[in-house]
C-alpha cells in the first residue's frame, strides 16, 4: 500500500520518516508550492508531487496541513475525483455524512432518519486522514462525497522537526469503521498506541493536550523569568530549571496517577512556605500562583482536612501574609 502525505511541516515530516522506518512505501509528498515540495522531497527521499497526484497515486493519504486549510484542501482534491458514487458511510457521531449522486447531506444538518444509512465504501476507495486534534471528520466531507473513506489521525505528541520516535505515542482516531481500522493498523506499525476520540469530544480532548504541552511552556517561561534574576540571563535560567522539569517528568512516568508525583510545600502541608511565596511574588504572578495553588491543594493526596482548609484560605487571600500577624 502506497501512502502519501500532503503537507511537510513538523507532523508531515515526522509521518514520512515514521512510515519509512516502519517499512511502508511513501509514494509521494506535496506542499503548497513546487519549491517547497522539491525541498521536502529531497530532504525526505520520497517523490515530490502535486496534491492531486498524491491522491491519485496513493491509496492512503494524510493531510498534515493547518486546521484552517483542511477543508479547502479537501475540496480542491475532491474536485478532481469521481463524484458519481451513490452512497457511502464516511464517519460516526455528529460528523456522519451520507453522499448521494445528487449531492451531500450531513447528519448535523437535519438529515431525515431514513437517510442515515451506514453503508460500506467500495473496496477500492481511498482513505484520507487529517491530522488535526480539534477538527472533526466533517472537514473532509467533500472527499467523502467523492467516494473516499475519511478519518482523523492525531498523534498526541509535540514534534520538534528533526528525527522523531513514534514509539509509545498515543494516536487519537475518529472516522468511519474502515478508516479507523486502517488508522489503528498504521498507528501500531509506527509503534504507537491507537485510541478513539469521537467528534463531539475532539475540542475537549485537544484542550487537555494544550494544557499539558502548551501551558507547560507558558509556566516554564514565567519560571525562567524569575530564575534569570540569579543566573544572569534567560537561557541560563531555563537551563537551571530543566533538570527540575525532567525530574518531575520522571516522577510522573513512575507514578501512574499524576497527583501521586506531587512534591513541594503544598504536598507536605507547609503553609509557612506558601505564605513566604505570596509575600514576595511580583504582582503579575500572583493570580496564576494562587489559582494553580488552589488546584494543587485539591489534588494533593497526603493532606488532611485541616491542612487543606488552611492552605486554601491562604491562597484565596483570606489570611494575612507573612511579616504580619497571622490571625
Give, region by region, the residue ranges found by the protein language model.
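NAD(P)+-binding Rossmann beta1-loop-alpha1 motif at the extreme N-terminus of oxidoreductases
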Residues: 1-53
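Short, hydrophobic beta-strand segments that form beta-sheet elements in well-ordered domains
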Residues: 27-31, 128-131, 171-174
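Rossmann-like NAD(P)(H) cofactor-binding subdomain of soluble oxidoreductases
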Residues: 34, 38-39, 43-103, 112-164
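Internal alpha-helical scaffold of NAD(P)-dependent oxidoreductase catalytic cores
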Residues: 40, 143-149, 164-254
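Serine residues within intrinsically disordered or low-complexity segments
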Residues: 106-108
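Interdomain hinge/lid region at the active-site interface
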Residues: 248, 253-307
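NAD(P)-dependent dehydrogenase/reductase Rossmann-like domain
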Residues: 307-327
Amino acid at each position: 500500500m502506497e501512502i502519501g502525505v500532503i503537507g511537510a511541516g513538523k507532523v508531515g515530516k515526522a509521518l514520512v520518516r515514521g512510515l519509512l522506518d516502519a517499512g511502508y512505501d511513501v509514494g509521494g509528498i506535496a506542499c503548497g508550492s513546487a519549491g517547497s515540495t522539491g525541498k521536502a522531497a529531497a530532504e525526505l527521499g520520497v517523490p515530490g508531487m502535486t496534491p492531486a497526484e498524491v491522491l491519485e497515486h496513493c491509496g492512503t493519504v494524510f493531510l498534515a496541513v493547518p486546521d484552517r486549510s483542511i477543508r479547502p484542501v479537501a475540496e480542491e482534491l475532491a474536485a478532481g475525483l469521481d463524484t458519481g458514487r451513490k452512497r457511502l458511510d464516511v464517519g460516526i457521531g455528529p460528523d456522519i455524512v451520507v453522499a448521494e449522486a445528487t449531492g451531500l447531506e450531513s447528519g448535523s444538518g437535519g438529515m431525515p432518519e431514513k437517510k442515515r444509512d451506514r453503508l460500506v465504501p467500495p473496496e477500492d476507495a481511498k482513505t484520507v486522514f487529517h491530522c488535526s486534534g480539534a477538527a472533526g471528520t466533517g472537514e473532509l466531507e467533500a472527499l467523502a462525497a467523492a467516494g473516499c473513506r475519511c478519518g482523523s489521525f492525531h498523534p498526541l505528541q509535540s514534534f520538534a522537526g528533526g528525527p522523531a520516535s513514534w514509539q509509545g505515542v498515543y494516536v487519537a482516531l475518529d472516522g468511519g469503521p474502515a478508516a479507523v481500522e486502517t488508522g489503528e493498523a498504521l498507528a501500531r506499525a509506527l509503534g504507537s498506541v491507537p485510541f478513539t476520540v469521537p467528534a463531539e469530544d475532539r475540542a475537549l480532548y485537544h484542550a487537555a493536550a494544550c494544557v499539558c504541552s502548551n501551558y507547560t511552556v507558558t509556566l516554564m517561561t514565567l519560571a525562567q523569568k524569575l530564575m534569570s534574576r540569579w543566573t544572569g540571563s534567560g537561557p541560563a535560567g531555563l537551563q537551571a530549571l530543566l533538570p527540575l522539569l525532567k525530574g518531575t517528568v520522571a516522577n510522573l512516568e513512575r507514578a501512574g496517577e499524576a497527583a501521586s508525583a506531587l512534591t513541594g510545600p503544598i504536598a507536605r502541608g507547609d503553609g509557612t512556605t506558601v505564605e513566604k511565596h505570596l509575600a514576595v511574588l511580583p504582582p503579575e504572578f500572583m493570580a496564576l500562583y494562587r489559582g494553580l495553588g488552589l488546584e494543587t491543594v485539591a489534588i494533593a493526596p497526603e493532606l488532611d482536612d485541616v491542612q487543606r482548609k488552611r492552605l486554601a484560605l491562604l491562597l484565596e487571600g483570606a489570611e494575612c501574609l507573612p511579616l504580619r500577624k497571622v490571625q
